[in-house]
Amino acid sequence: MEFQRLENKTAMDWLYEKTDARNLQGEIDTYWVQQGGCDPVAWCRKLNRRLPLIHLKDYTVIGGRPSFAPVGHGNLDMPAIVNAADAAGCEWFIVEQDDCYGADPFEALAHSYRYLETLARK
């Protein structure tokens, strides 16, 4: 719903345009931004200095359906997302995976962690 278009803007656009940054900060979820038809990198940039937290979730397609994946193992441009969030002043990068589809969630977390370590070294 938050990315539904109303007069060429999303509900999120309206919300952030009408509020002062001192009163409203953001926390986006990369998977759901993408699923909502928007670009997570663009949203990090829109929320410059208003994005203290970000939920990093990767997006993939399994059997023709949108699905969750460990960070770095899906279709989202995680290096660009992490860089944009960092430039926006993000302080907390939270790894989350709503569904592991029967896999061990701790193993999925380990995959995400190892991938993010490679980004931190660059």
Regions found by a protein language model. Give the residues of each.
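Histidine-acidic metal/acid-base catalytic patches
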Residues: R5-I28, W32-K122
